[in-house]
From Swiss-Prot:
One of its GO terms (cellular component) is cytosolic small ribosomal subunit. It comes from Acinetobacter baumannii (strain AB0057). The gene is rpsC. Belongs to the universal ribosomal protein uS3 family. This is Small ribosomal subunit protein uS3. SMART domains: KH.
Amino acid sequence: MGQKVHPIGIRLGVVKRHNANWYANPKQYAEYLLKDLQVREFLTKNLKNAMVSNILIERPSGAAKVTISTARPGIVIGKKGEDIEKLQRELTNIMGVPAQVSINEIDRPDLDARLVAEAIASQLEKRVMFRRAMKRAVQNTMRAGAKGIKVEVSGRLGGAEIARTEWYREGRVPLHTLRADIDYATMRAETTYGTIGVKVWIFRGEILGGMKQVMNPAPAEERPAKRGRGRGEGQERRGRRGDRAADKGE
C-alpha cells in the first residue's frame, strides 16, 4: 500500500534547510554526529518549557554555533542572561570547542508544526478530549494565517480498547508540490491508557523565490496554410495524363 514520504526530507535543498550545517572528514563524521545528538537531547531536556521548535547546529573552523528557535526566548536567556551563559558553558563541554548560542524568536507559534503538536500532546496528557484538542489546534492555526492544516492522532483514543486513527483537515495541504512550504512534526502523548501519536502538517504558502521566471515564448512566424488537393483538381490532372498517353499512342 502507498506510504507518505517525509514532507521536510523531500524538500531539503528546494525550500527547506538542513538542521546541521558542517563538513567533516570521514573519520570525524561519526564523532560530530554523536555530539550533535547529545546537544539536541540536552537542550530538549533542559528547555522543555521554552517551546523550542528547531535547533540549528553550525561548525565554523574551530568553533560551534547553536541557534535555538523558541517562542519563549525569556526562559532560554534567563535573568540578565545568566541561563544562556550557563548553556554556552555546558555546550562547550559537550562539543569540545567554544560554542556560541543565539536565539531566534518565533513570532507566530500557531504556524509552527512542532509547537502545535506539542500543544495537542500536552492537552491529551491532561485528559482533554482528543476531538476538542484537534479542532482547537486547527482553528487557531487557520486563524493565524495558514493556508491549510492536517492533524492526525492514533492510539487508544478516549481509552478505547482497540487503537484507531482519526484526522482532521482544513484548507489545502499539497504534499506533492515541492515549492509548497509545508511544516511537519510528530509528538508522543503518554497517557494512562498508553501512547498516542500526534502528527501535524501545516501549509504556509508557496515559496517562489530563486526560481527562474518563465518568459513568454516569441510568437512563431506565420506560414501560409497548406492546401490539400481537391477532388476536382485531382480529376483534372488525371485527365491531362490520359490525354498525353493518347497522343503518344497515336
